[in-house]
Regions:
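N-terminal core-binding DNA-recognition domain of tyrosine site-specific recombinases/integrases
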Residues: 14-18, 26-94, 98-100, 208-212, ...
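Basic, Lys/Arg- and aromatic-enriched nucleic-acid-binding interface segment
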Residues: 82, 97, 101-103, 107-152, ...
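Short, basic (Lys/Arg/His-rich) helix/loop patches that form interaction surfaces
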Residues: 133, 185, 199-208, 215-260, ...
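Major-groove DNA-contacting interfaces characterized by cationic-aromatic clusters
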Residues: 57, 102-103, 166, 171-173, ...
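N-terminal helical hairpins
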Residues: 1-15, 31
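Catalytic-site neighborhood detector that most strongly recognizes the C-terminal catalytic loop/helix
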Residues: 16, 176-178, 192, 248, ...
Length: 283
């Protein structure tokens, strides 16, 4: 009987899958880490889904490397690859301790070059003044991005029904993230005339153009300014200018960053006044 139990235990060790190993390891490891760290492990595990149902004794070096190679093909960052390697390393170290596996190949994985991330650049006051001087529909779009902090996708999805002219604010109904949906952004007094004109001149969407068309004109205007900005630099500029003067919670609310329980977001007159006060700090 004892010999049978030993054989059965060995067989179970030989058939445990990577998914089963993860589900066994995470509850133990999560006792000493933050919720955000637990979430990052779940995200990393999704990248190894191709081998997650394989018995760990059948997973060799090339299986690991193929996971990393696949991430490169998808254009994922060095940081993402490193997080996956870290997770695999922890899992197989745990497997060795539990006598499920005898080899950890992760230290030999090649992650590829660590290419620096894009350095965002802030629009200068001189560049913003030149945008006002250019005075075209596309320079107006860039100014609206600068004074609202909207993502370009959010701007292109704005409809007339999202603009509350009497109260002088807009509502973002189509956002990149759930945290950004339904947020209120007061309209700065300098861009209110631009919004009013768009409201009068359009039928449904404020900007009836594609991203490709806008991107082309954006690059043309950047040439006029003799600078190399990306569209996202407008949002970065908005955040940077307000970061030093606006309360952190107010800035997160304007940018649509997650804070607390987003399902219970309630705007009061006081909240909107605080948002407007922050927006008007922009010059």
């Amino acid at each position: 009987m004892r010999r049978y139990a030993v054989i059965l235990n060995r067989r179970q060790r030989n058939t445990i899958t990577l998914r089963q190993l993860f589900n066994e390891w995470l509850p133990i490891h999560s006792q000493s880490i933050s919720d955000s760290a637990v979430k990052s492990y779940h995200i990393a595990f999704k990248h190894i889904s191709n081998i997650s149902d394989m018995p760990i004794t059948n997973i060799h070096f090339q299986h690991h490397q193929n996971v990393i190679n696949s991430m490169h093909v998808k254009g994922l960052s060095y940081s993402s690859c490193k997080k996956v390697r870290t997770l695999l390393n922890k899992l197989f170290n745990y497997a060795i301790i539990k006598d499920y596996a005898i080899t950890n190949y992760t230290l030999h994985l090649k992650l590829g070059p660590n290419i620096p991330t894009i350095q965002r650049k802030v629009f200068t006051r001189q560049q913003i003044n030149k945008l006002w001087a250019i005075d075209t529909s596309y320079s107006h779009m860039i100014l609206i991005l600068l004074y609202t902090g909207l993502r370009i996708g959010e701007l292109l999805n704005l409809r007339k029904q999202d603009i509350y002219r009497r109260s002088s604010y807009l509502i973002v109904r189509h956002a990149k993230t759930k945290a950004g949906e339904g947020r209120i952004i007061p309209i700065h007094h300098r861009i209110m005339p631009l919004i009013e004109q768009l409201y009068r001149d359009t039928d449904e969407y404020l900007f009836a153009i594609s991203y490709t068309t806008f991107h082309k004109h954006f690059k043309d205007i950047m040439k006029q300014l003799n600078c190399k900005h990306t569209i996202h630099d407008t949002r970065h500029t908005f955040a940077s200018l307000l970061d030093a003067v606006a309360p952190p919670n107010t800035l997160r609310s304007l940018l649509g960053h997650k804070q607390g329980d987003i399902t219970t977001r309630v705007y009061t007159h006081k909240t909107i006044r605080e948002l407007r006060k922050a927006i008007e700090l922009l010059k």
